[in-house]
Amino acid sequence: MTVRNLDALFQPKSVAIIGASLRPDSVGAKVWRRVREAGFNGPVWPVNPKYAELDGCAVFADAADLLEAPSVALICTPSETWVDVVGKLGRLGTRAAVIVSDTDDSSSPLVSHVLAAAKPHLLRIVGPGSLGVVTPAVNAHFGAPSAMVKTGGVAWVSQSNALTNAVLGWAAARGLGFSHAIALGGEADVDAGDVLDYLASDPATRAILLELSVVRAARKFMSAARAAARNKPVLVLRTGRSDPSDALYGAAFRRSGMVRVDSLDDLIDEIETLGVGRIAASSSATLVTSDRGVAALAADAFAAANTTLAHWPDAALAAVASALPRAAGGNPLVLGNDAKPEHFGLALEALAPHRETGTAFVVHASTLGAPVAEVARVLIERQRFAYRGMLACFFGGVDDETRDALRAHGIALHSTPHRLARAFARLVDYRLGRELLMQTPQGLPAQVPVAIEAAQASAKAALTAGQTMLEGADAASLLSGFGLVVSSDADSAAPAEGLHDDEHIVDVTVTLRDDADFGPVFEFTAPPADEASAPFSVYGLPPLNPVLASEIVSRSPYAQRAPVAPVLDALTALSEAVCCVEQIVGLTAVLRVTRTRARLVGPRLALGQQRGRLAIVPYPRQLEETLDWRGRRLTIRPIRPEDEPAHSDFIAGMTPNDLRMRFFGAVSGFDHSQLARMTQIDYDREM
């Protein structure tokens, strides 16, 4: 996990174009022309032995002839030159290079030699096969993107050159901008995880849009994605939804806190919402319009997007009735077909003091008494009253001047209520997902070290003896050490006769499968809600705690059919077993659930040797130690999420001077989200 030298890539001071050319249709000519047209803020040094000058600029014959190291080098030469060029750039002190080429094969021996030439100099490589990197704030359009884009607050990260070109072109045509945009190419060195890690703390980036088809380094990617999604919205589009592993990707995205979108249209809509509008601080909405038909259409769109219309308190109803006596109060708020532009402003003012009314959505079709341009002017004047954010939809569109004025004042604009509602729903999904992942879980039952050691010894002994599968009494013995109630008899997989109906028996299947991209993944398969439906499986990545296990179960038909608590206990115990016994690479068992307990029936454990196999590093039990201190026996261990209450008590007992020395400033207290950041750490990157 490293962001080393990525600042040179995204905040370049100078650039060298290796292979700059005037030859029509050559990569070097396209890149040279694009960099020149963009007007990069720093020096541009072309390198090509075939030219003495290009467009009035002196040309260097060789990369080694450069008088100083460029921040970034754009390599546009044939592949057989890459190793030599990278070596020379590295010796100069160049910190980043982008290989702009037609091929994105990162597995070839040639690319291995390129990385070997770069490694001694800590030179970062983007590509091969990258379209380029764009940072509009410094007019850096490095590569061959077809469109020039403005500066904005959203970053675009993609594995596809074609989609990058399309999105940049779409944004440029609509006057939208980016903080950064990068097409990763073959990801031989710099990959999606590295870029997410950098953008997570980039002050110019308010949100991240990610397009990918495959994750190449799951552990690094998950760590970076979780860190980024805690700081700002990360929305992801994965192409290839027909891929059998797509459901696993969905589980990984949810676990990291990213929000998945279904189409490129959805992703493009978020460029408007996140790049222009103030990110809504509410999960509910108030609709303001002048027409009942428009109100009904908008309300239907919000219902279809599973977005909640706010329930107004009596005080809000009274305030609106006082300010707008002729309006049809309630949500949606219908001002009437004779409404004037100022009535929209009065509505915003009346709603402003009442947090329960949520984010304001103005949906309007132009009328004689309220032309769109005049309503937009009022929204701009009164946008200071939209404390919880404001978005707008004007049927029929607006002229460029009005659109630009709305955006300049932080009011995002969408063409239809449907797109407006879906864009807001994704922000709500992000907020709710982040809140879920930051919940403080209940403490897990303490695992006895002796039991863990016995389970590990059992698995090691079986592998040494040539066994790759444990079942029956052997599997039951290993798992029972983690507090699971286990029946080793596979024949008992059918529900036992003679049990009372009030025990409400339900059987679910729990499988641990080894995914090629994400390693071990739990598959939870519940019986269908009716006989006409097929069994439905949901997935989750270990390690699991009760909160994360609950999220898995809530997405299955089981959540509405049987007691949940026994299943959560069983899933978290199975997760502990998988995390503590690294030899477990697969598992299949039936989980029989009654009202009071869940029993594991007929488990089968697949064994193997796969170190570092989990995509998310579990609690590092091996770092626990004990020591004697002033006559007491103390346990020193890594912090856990369930330590939040104790950590809060610890901070509350500190003196003001202790707080100032520990947190480098005056501190009055910490809320849940701040405490969660201290206790819910990433063990891979923070320990």
PLM regions: where:
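Short acidic N-proximal helix/loop "leader" segments that mark the beginning
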Residues: 456, 467-468, 611-629
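Catalytic-core regions of core metabolic enzymes
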Residues: 1-602
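Catalytic strand-loop segment that frames the active site of acyl-thioester-processing enzymes
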Residues: 650-658
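A short helix-loop-beta-strand connector motif used in the catalytic cores of GNAT acetyltransferases and
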Residues: 668-669, 673-687
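Divalent-metal-activated hydrolytic enzyme cores
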Residues: 594, 598-621
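A short beta-loop-alpha structural element at the N-terminal edge
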Residues: 634-646
